[in-house]
UniProtKB/Swiss-Prot annotation:
GO biological process entries: L-histidine biosynthetic process
Family that this chain belongs to: Belongs to the ATP phosphoribosyltransferase family. Long subfamily.
Record organism: Shewanella sp. (strain MR-7)
Transmembrane segments: none
Cofactor: Mg(2+)
Subcellular locations according to the entry: Cytoplasm
Gene3D superfamilies noted in UniProt: 3.30.70.120, Periplasmic binding protein-like II
Lineage start: Bacteria, Pseudomonadati, Pseudomonadota, Gammaproteobacteria, Alteromonadales
Official protein name in the record: ATP phosphoribosyltransferase
Enzyme type, top EC level: transferase
Annotated catalysed reactions: 1-(5-phospho-beta-D-ribosyl)-ATP + diphosphate = 5-phospho-alpha-D-ribose 1-diphosphate + ATP
Length: 299
């Protein structure tokens, strides 16, 4: 493949999203090594280049056709999308799928001594945020006027530093808010990581590679969400046992050697098999119950 036909994928340079993105690509069979001194990593076994950039640069790189794919948080993507709509600037991309990592929420938070009833409690106050567009959209929908304080980092210290009355920031556990004398009041946006693709014209070979990678991503996520279940069951309670298997579709039932009263059941379950379910299976006569992770799935 020529340089122009190499697939360019933008991922976050550092942080949790970077680690999870790299692990996902490696699980899809893309072999590469990261040199912390370099912003580009070349795959060893596929015509793929990984560009390691700041997360808020990824949507623009995809929308402008500089890269072909990007792995990004939906919050950052939505922030850029609103910005471009405001500026009447094109955003040529499609979201291929949501991923199973990068969960977070964008929330309003105020000092612990603040009496908060609803979002209208912030009328006319100053709110610090790194996501001015998402905040503005939410407040406009609520019909609330406010003053914003744009910060690129350390938003949670703004009230204590006298820069703002409240904040709008990403929350995971809430521990950072608590450490800074704040409490979460309202979630304005929930986010996961996602894969986006530029809609600018792709060569047939590059699009085929994108489709191939996406198929593998789908398989990896399906495998992570599934478990392989094996057990022995008496034929007289077979239907009841199959009905108990969570999310299982068409389990395989096999005869056991020298035992006409019992069968082996193999099933792929898309839900967790909890201890109480296993105890119910045992009560119905099931034995040798094994629940195993699945590394890869396809088809």
């Amino acid at each position: 493949m020529t340089e122009s036909n190499r697939l360019r994928i933008a991922i976050q340079k550092s942080g949790r999203l970077s680690t999870d993105s790299q692990q996902l690509l490696k699980s899809c069979g893309v072999k590469f090594s990261i040199n912390e001194q370099s912003l580009i990593a070349h795959a060893d076994n596929m015509p793929i280049d990984l560009l390691r950039v700041r997360d808020d640069d990824i949507p623009g790189l995809v929308m402008d056709g500089v890269v072909d794919l990007g792995i990004i948080g939906e919050n950052v993507l939505e922030e850029e999308q609103i910005e471009r709509q405001t500026l009447n600037k094109p955003a040529e991309f499609v979201k291929l799928r949501q991923l199973d990592f990068g969960a977070c929420r964008l929330s309003l938070a105020v000092p612990t001594e603040f009496s908060y009833a609803d979002a209208s409690s912030l009328e006319g106050l100053r709110i610090a945020t790194s996501y001015p567009n998402l905040l503005r959209r939410f407040m406009q929908q609520k019909g609330i006027s406010y003053r914003d304080c744009m910060l690129k980092g350390s938003v949670e210290v703004a009230p204590r530093a006298g820069l703002a009355d409240g904040i709008c920031d990403l929350v995971s556990t809430g521990a950072t808010l608590e450490a800074n004398g704040l409490y979460e009041t309202e979630v304005i946006y929930r986010s996961m990581a996602c894969v986006i693709q530029s809609t600018q014209t792709q060569t047939p070979s590059k699009q085929a590679l994108i489709d191939r990678i996406l198929s593998r991503v789908n398989g990896v996520i399906r495998a992570r969400e599934s478990k392989y279940i094996l057990l022995h069951a008496p034929t007289e309670t077979l239907d009841q046992i199959v009905a108990l298997l969570p999310g299982a579709e068409n389990p395989t039932v096999l005869p056991l050697n020298d035992d006409t009263n019992r069968v082996a059941i193999h099933a792929v379950s898309t839900e967790d098999l909890f201890w109480d379910t296993m105890e119910q299976l045992t009560a119905l006569g099931a034995s040798s119950i094994l629940v195993m992770p699945i590394e890869k799935m396809m088809g």
